[in-house]
Amino acid sequence: MTTGQEAEQLARTYLEKQGLEYVAHNVRYPFGELDLVMRHQDFWVFVEVKFRTNTQFGGALQAIRPKQIQRIRKAANHYLQLNKINAPCRFDVLAIDGLQINWLQGCF
């Protein structure tokens, strides 16, 4: 795997196998982007996908910064408002380090 797009496709497939339903990907606003939008039971799930081919300079999880979390939250709120969605949501991270996948639910 060499691109972010491939990582997002792998993440989507992995999450669908875990029972989540795909809704959208790469939702972009001027102030932030949502990698994956999924549904899981009654929850809307906003998934940040992080990918690293090696961990020499830190793993995929270390790549998430507070400012990025702010942008993701803002984009998710905007998505919910635009689509008139009034339901619980959560923010997950799917970190891919080489061939290892770590799915963290409700991270922020």
UniProtKB/Swiss-Prot annotation:
Domain of life: Bacteria
Gene3D superfamilies the record matches: 3.40.1350.10
InterPro entries: Restrct_endonuc-II-like, tRNA_endonuc-like_dom_sf, UPF0102_YraN-like
A molecular function GO annotation: nucleic acid binding
Pfam families, sorted: UPF0102 (PF02021)
Family recorded in the similarity comment: Belongs to the UPF0102 family.
HAMAP family xref list: UPF0102
Name recorded for this polypeptide: UPF0102 protein Sden_0272
Organism: Shewanella denitrificans (strain OS217 / ATCC BAA-1090 / DSM 15013)
